[in-house]
C-alpha cells in the first residue's frame, strides 16, 4: 500500500479489495478461473439444494433485465426433470457471458460467493493479501480507526477471502463489509448509504482504492459532499 498521511478529520477507513488489499492476479487468475472450471460440476452436485435454487432464481431475474442487451443468454425454467440438464447448461452459459463482460451483478456475485465458500472451506482456495496489508490494518486499528471493506464482490465472498487468508483469519481486524447491495462504487449514493449505515459523517470516511474510475470524482466539486469519502490512493 502506498504510504500516506490520513487526513485529520478521518475516523473510518473504507478499503477496496482488488488491487488494494489483494493482487488483481488473485481475482483474475485464481478466483474467476475456479468459477469457470467448476460451475457445471457445482450445479450438478447442489442443484436440489434450496440455496442453489435461490441463486438460479436471482440469475433468471437478472437475465430478464438483460434481455435488451446484445448477445444476452436467457435462462429458461425447467418444466420437467428431463429439462434440468438444458437449464444447467443455460445457467453455465449465462454466467460465462456475464463474466466475459466483467459484469458485477448481485445475482452473479451471489452464486460465485457460494462456490468460493465451498472451495475455501475444503482448502481448495486461500485468500491472498499484499504483505503490507495486515501490518497497515493493525497499525490503523492501534491508532483508533474503524476499518470496513467495500467491494463489488459479495459480502460473503469478502468474508471468505479474509477469513481463510494466507495470513490466517483476518475478520477480527475488520468492523464490517459492504457490497453492491448498497450501490455501485461509481455512484455517489452508495457512499452516503455506507455513511448512514455505520452512523458516520461522510467527511470522516476515507475510501482507498487503486481504480480511479471507481470514484465519483465529480463529487469533489459539490460542496454538499466531502472529498474525503471519495479520495483514492493508488497502490
Swiss-Prot record:
UniProt cross-references to InterPro entries, sorted A to Z: Enolase-ppase_E1, ENOPH1_eukaryotes, HAD-like_sf, HAD_sf
Classification via Pfam families: Hydrolase (PF00702)
Binding site for Mg(2+): 16, 18, 210
EC number: 3.1.3.77
Annotated GO biological process: L-methionine salvage from methylthioadenosine
Primary enzyme class: hydrolase
Positions contributing to substrate binding: 151-152, 185
Disulfide bonds: none
NCBIfam families: enolase-ppase (TIGR01691)
Task of the protein: Bifunctional enzyme that catalyzes the enolization of 2,3-diketo-5-methylthiopentyl-1-phosphate (DK-MTP-1-P) into the intermediate 2-hydroxy-3-keto-5-methylthiopentenyl-1-phosphate (HK-MTPenyl-1-P), which is then dephosphorylated to form the acireductone 1,2-dihydroxy-3-keto-5-methylthiopentene (DHK-MTPene).
Protein name: Enolase-phosphatase E1
Gene: enoph1
